[in-house]
Amino acid sequence: MCSKITLVLTLFSSYFISTDAVNGSFPALLAFGDSILDTGNNNFLLTFMKGNIWPYGRSFSMRRATGRFGNGRVFSDIVAEGLGIKKILPAYRKLFNSPSDLRTGVCFASGGAGVDPVTSKLLRVLTPKDQVNDFKGYIRKLKATAGPSRASSIVSNAVILVSQGNNDIGISYFGTPTAAFRGLTPNRYTTKLAGWNKQFMKELYDQGARKFAVMGVIPLGCLPMTRIFLGGFVITCNFFANRVAEQYNGKLRSGTKSWGREAGFRGAKFVYVDMYNTLMDVIKNYRRYGFSNEKNGCCCMITAIIPCPNPDKYVFYDFVHPSEKAYRTISKKLVQDIKNGLA
């Protein structure tokens, strides 16, 4: 009789623990970084970096602007769906998150944020330290709703999706003279960025995170804004901006291969998420993927004061952010890379 009770308790315990893994792998998605992932945290900040105004959100449910920088869902939402977790990743700073929201993951990212300490302060958005502090607050809430043991299991098995560097290179390095004043060449600056990114993930690791999906930056030289200001008469991609982006990505890629072997990251897994080449493939072969415009944004530009009628035909929705369809297109490969690298 005792052995039967033990068996039942073991099976029940196994079942309870397994509920922390969706499809046998990941119980939650926790997103950090910039506007590629931000699902509405900036709504509650005193900053001009806002995505909760028209024409953002026009493809979202009920055609409402939620704080996402795009026409609909952003990359963090789509990754959450691709991992089998949920279709919408809520912002941590929204007024209310249910226990279910907390157990399956939230977003800490902030549009305009960067890993360079200068970047977030320039735009008055959440700094890396702010996001880490929010993560600590999230863990306290998760422990209160799920219990300490289950909360620890959720955090250690969650995918930690990190997007940092786009604003640092695009704004702090190319858009302002701050990097030049600090005497930083592209090589030195991208080395510092990669180091700051590693330090940020170590702070998340120290709170229990173990599975990191580290996103490279997108082709910054091919953004509609870059093409207009630096692309010349034919508004081509800017080679130098792309070269710096690739330089940074190369250092991130190398880091994801070595950090997991360091004593300070014992038990952690890292996978590099190649945003640059997957999006560049869509830009170069846009017609093959069902787009009709790869150079201009659908809205919010000098060339598109009135929003286009169909954002699904545009690779970019505004002057820097991909459209939801572009995110869905590149996610097919990238989500599989995350699954393979962190399973």
Swiss-Prot record:
Flower buds and pollen. It is found in: Secreted, Extracellular space, Extracellular matrix, Pollen coat. Its EC number is 3.1.1.-. The active site is at 35 (nucleophile), 318, 321. Keywords: Extracellular matrix, Glycoprotein, Hydrolase, Lipid degradation, Lipid metabolism, Secreted, Signal. GO terms for molecular function: lipase activity. Belongs to the 'GDSL' lipolytic enzyme family. This is GDSL esterase/lipase EXL4. It comes from Arabidopsis thaliana. The gene is EXL4.
